[in-house]
Regions:
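A general sequence property marking short-to-moderate contiguous segments
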Residues: 263-273
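OB-fold/S1-family single-stranded nucleic acid-binding modules
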Residues: 334-349
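Structural detector for short beta-strands of small beta-barrel domains
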Residues: 272-295
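Short aromatic-glycine-enriched beta-strand elements
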Residues: 295-301
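Amphipathic alpha-helical interface elements
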Residues: 1-265
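Beta-strand/loop nucleic-acid-binding surfaces
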Residues: 305-322
Length: 349
């Protein structure tokens, strides 16, 4: 009953995508194990995708600004640089697109505007950059924005060396075309969307055996590493630090798939855990000494960091009249915009 309840809650139709003969999902338990394997792959994939998204959008934006500043220095006298650079449109990627020239990009921007307004955030370049999707930035990496197209926005090839300094042909050493780079990014965006919609990462119509499925996942991840290198090789070190590459290596194996297929068999014997955080949460309390007391509040010096905390009468167990100067107390700290942080739930020791 437990396995059936899980598969029904995950959607029978969606679950059927894991019932591939090639993966050996002969039973509901094994199919659930394949689902769990995909969940772990998605989790290991996420840091690489996040690095690509953040580094790509920042590289495109900053490269455009740097190019415009460079043009100012080439075309104006030094005493005019500050004035002319101030005229550079910091929202160039927002103001460029209209309903007429690029409806999809314009629609993405309108969605970002609505989100920022809803969150009561200013419409700054930084906030727009964080709200626009990976797909928006990927759509800029194509020959439509090449100088030869003479379109409403020109990005390439003059920004290529800034955005993708290491995107070169491994044989000739010559820079890769923007279309070649863009095609790789489009494939990565498809993987990101597949992951966000909880779909299998291994789709491969030409797969004959399970090894082909696993190799497809490896190819997807390798593509991510390649693009990260193109933009900034140093970011690859981040994946090593958090052991993402190690996790992917462990998961992309026949043994990992087999192991996950066995896991659900023991589910019926497991207890449902409803108190996970118990024993995990870290005690945030401080101890300290009351160093000043009035009719309405106290000041407490923390033993932990020697900071001074403000405690109101309403935060004191039993009321302020039950406390005295130099009393030892326990309290929960809380940040405040006032002179002192707050002390909450104040109790005598």
């Amino acid at each position: 009953m437990t396995i059936q309840a899980i598969t029904e809650s995950l959607s029978t139709a969606r679950f059927s995508t894991y019932q591939l003969p090639i993966l050996g999902g002969a039973s509901p338990e094994q199919c659930l194990g394949i689902y769990l394997w995909n969940k772990q792959l998605a989790s290991a994939f996420l840091p690489a995708l996040q690095i690509i998204e953040i580094s790509l959008r920042n590289a495109i934006y900053q490269s455009w600004i740097a190019h415009e500043e460079e043009q100012v220095e080439l075309n104006f006298q030094p005493h005019d640089w500050v004035t002319e650079k101030a005229k550079i449109d910091k929202l160039w990627f927002v103001n460029t697109f209209t309903r007429q020239n690029n409806f999809i990009a314009w629609s993405n921007i309108q969605t970002a505007v609505k989100q920022l307004n809803y969150e009561n955030k200013p419409l700054t370049a930084e906030n727009f950059i964080s709200k626009l999707t990976l797909g928006f930035w990927v759509s800029l990496v194509q020959k439509d924005f090449d100088v030869q197209k003479n379109s409403y926005l020109t990005l390439w090839p003059h920004l290529r060396h800034r955005v993708f300094p290491n995107a070169v042909d491994s044989t000739s050493g010559s820079p890769l075309s923007i279309n070649s780079i863009g095609n790789e990014l489009k494939d990565i965006n498809k993987i990101r969307n597949r992951l966000s919609h909880h779909e299998p990462l291994w789709r491969n119509k030409k797969a004959y055996q399970v090894e082909d499925i696993i190799n497809k996942v490896i190819e997807h991840y390798e593509r991510c590493l390649k693009v990260i290198y193109w933009i900034n090789p140093s970011n690859l070190k981040l994946l090593d630090i958090i052991e993402s590459n190690t996790r992917m290596s462990d998961l992309c194996s026949l043994h990992a798939l087999w192991k996950n297929k066995q896991l659900p068999a023991g589910i019926p014997t497991l207890q449902v855990r409803k108190d996970w955080s118990k024993g995990v949460k870290i005690n945030p309390e401080h101890t300290g000494e009351i160093i000043n007391i009035t009719a309405a509040n106290v000041l407490i010096k923390s033993d932990k960091n020697q900071a001074i905390f403000y405690g109101a009468d309403r935060a004191m167990q039993g009321g302020i009249n039950t406390f005295a100067l130099n009393d030892k107390v326990r309290f929960t700290p809380e940040a405040s915009s006032a002179k002192y942080p707050n002390a909450k739930n104040i109790m005598k020791l």
